[in-house]
Amino acid sequence: MENQLWQNTLRCCEQYQESPQDAENILFLLLGLIILVNISINVATAMWQGLQNAIDKMIFWMNQKTEVVQVTECPPKEPQPANVQDVHIHCILDPVQVKMAQPTQCSSSSSHYFCKRSNDRRSRRRYGYQQGNLQIHQSSQQQGCLSHQQRLRNRPLSRGYPPFRKQPQGHKMSQMRPMPFFDMEDRDSLPEGHSCPHAKQPRRGWGSLCKPVRLASNVGLWGRQGGILASLPLPSLYLSPELRRLPKRVEAKSELRLQGFGPHYSQSRIWGTVEAEQWASSPPPPRRLLPNPSWVTVGYSSFPSGGHIPYDARDQWRRGTEGCEPPPAFVPRNPREVQGYRDHNSQAHRQNFSSHTHSQPNHSPPQSMGHVGYSSRESHEVRRRAPDWIEVFPSRHPLTTSTSLTALGEASYQRAPPASSGLMIPHSSQRLAEVQISDPTPPPTTFVPLSRNPGGNATYQVYDSLELKRQVQENRGRASSLPPPSTSASRPSLHRSRTGKLN
């Protein structure tokens, strides 16, 4: 019995030990199942993403293929609106880059009116170039037309003149301009040694009178109410649409380059010869005929201030006909000959110019150039041609009304030589003694702009329109305060550029 009981107890213990092992096995199975489920879920998601990407690529490729097939089979008649792009071009009219040029044809009524007036005098005209951004021409008239010239110069500009004269057509312009003006490069961009058209283009001959063109503005030609600079339109005109609607070809340029192209030119002479300046950058060949001193236009001195003087073209021609060799192109200064010449001719000039003292302050005969040497034959020639000066140049109006930057009272002929030369100028007349002003320090010849550079690759300087307007108003106020022109001394010599105001 005891053995049987012992076996029963052993069986119970074995059963108790087997039950916890079964529970542990069940737990391990559950954990294994959970891990397997997670792994399967991750694998399933990864496979689904890959499958989805593959499906998307396949759909995109199929769509592209269908679009290409549709385009090749039936091309669209009109472009897609989504592919159309609007192109906007904005053009800005810069007042600095605009140029004033002569119209090739009379396209307006005012130009037509001027063409009719210029046809009857075309046989008497000669044209000449003026260096600078303001290239202007004016027809010349023969001597003996004093009253007619006065009427032309003093005529008010309310009759509808065009801004510039029409250039004559035909062989004259073909000789003076071998290539069209607008086909050339900008003259300001040329170097100073090659910017003067005198050395490049042939002339019709210096025997004829070359005068500046009449500017058609409401301020007068000779600066009685402002001159060339005041005749420029206001800066607002360049920005207005009226400028674009002009019937004739217009390139307005609001700059004035008034620069001398030689070391012997002074700024005062440049400013005093805005209307008529025959620029010369280098001495011309000796065979070329130079301007006649007895035909020099108003405000222009054919004698450079460096002590050399070109010979008279008419005198050259006369000597050539007599069988003499033409004289050299330049004559060195000789103070002793000048002294004798001035003493010899003082009486003749006092008699010839007594009635024109109010109109001849800056274009007196060559006697005022004290550093110029003359022979006895040349002195007789100049004295014989003194009446030519009286007939050619009309009486100019006094500066009591207004002046401009074109210093009309500039005594370019009466500039005294430097004090170092030691030359005593005899007082041939009261007019010379009053007008002459000594300038011991030569003015600078470099061109200094008033305001700014236009920028870009341009090498030229420009004047600001506001600065020009201010200086014109200042000159008008200055001229209104001048005394009445009782004598020639009432017209002062406006050496404004020498003081650095205009430079």
From Swiss-Prot:
A Pfam family hit: Spem1
Organism superkingdom: Eukaryota
InterPro entries reported for this sequence: SPEM1_N
Membrane topology per record: Single-pass membrane protein
Composition bias type Basic residues, residue spans: 493-503
Assigned GO CC terms: membrane
Biased composition (Polar residues): 348-367
PANTHER family per record: SPEM FAMILY MEMBER 2, SPERMATID MATURATION PROTEIN 1
Name assigned to this protein: Uncharacterized protein SPEM2
Gene: Spem2
